[in-house]
Amino acid sequence: MALLIEDKKQIVAEVSEIASTAFAAVVADYQGLTVEQLTTLRVEARKLGVATRVVRNTLAKRALQDTPFSILNDDLVGPTILAFSTSEDDMGAAARLFEEFAKTNKVFELKAAAFEGKLYQGADVSVIANLPNQEKALTMLASVLQAPVSKLGRLITALKEKNESEAA
């Protein structure tokens, strides 16, 4: 069914709005998936705060034109689903979602991802998928900051014990 020009403009505006506030975008080939599998993917995406959209490639190119994700234009070929990480707390959510989905659905193929103006293609998408969410990042930072303090504490305890043993 052909889309009316008004419908096309609305789709471009919607995708462009999502892209303008997103932190990362991922493009994948969904050819061969069943409706149930795509529905499962979309449900999981909503749970994670990831915006997914199946759009005609020409409309997607127009929507991404003035965004940092325009670098994905060359990968907008064939059946394409877009995912945008819109949460500041978890910028790698879209890539992580698609990567996990691809593990269980072999026909689902990751094409590319864009993050902070850089293009990641194929297997390199895992770089974004492995980004920690905000909670994990803060935990990692706390453990890094805690390590020198605990070493200092052990050193002071060892010196104290050494001085006590020498005094006795």
Curated annotation (Swiss-Prot):
UniProt family annotation: Belongs to the universal ribosomal protein uL10 family.
Name of the coding gene: rplJ
InterPro entries reported in the protein's UniProt record: Ribosomal_uL10, Ribosomal_uL10-like_sf, Ribosomal_uL10_bac, Ribosomal_uL10_bac_type, Ribosomal_uL10_CS_bac
Coiled coil: none
Cited PANTHER family: 39S RIBOSOMAL PROTEIN L10, MITOCHONDRIAL
Pfam families, alphabetized: Ribosomal_L10
Entry's Gene Ontology BP terms: translation
Keywords, sorted A to Z: Ribonucleoprotein, Ribosomal protein, RNA-binding, rRNA-binding
HAMAP family: Ribosomal_uL10
Function of the protein: Forms part of the ribosomal stalk, playing a central role in the interaction of the ribosome with GTP-bound translation factors.
Self-association state and partner proteins as the record states: Part of the ribosomal stalk of the 50S ribosomal subunit. The N-terminus interacts with L11 and the large rRNA to form the base of the stalk. The C-terminus forms an elongated spine to which L12 dimers bind in a sequential fashion forming a multimeric L10(L12)X complex.
Protein name (Swiss-Prot/TrEMBL): Large ribosomal subunit protein uL10
Gene Ontology cellular component list: large ribosomal subunit
Gene Ontology molecular functions: large ribosomal subunit rRNA binding; structural constituent of ribosome
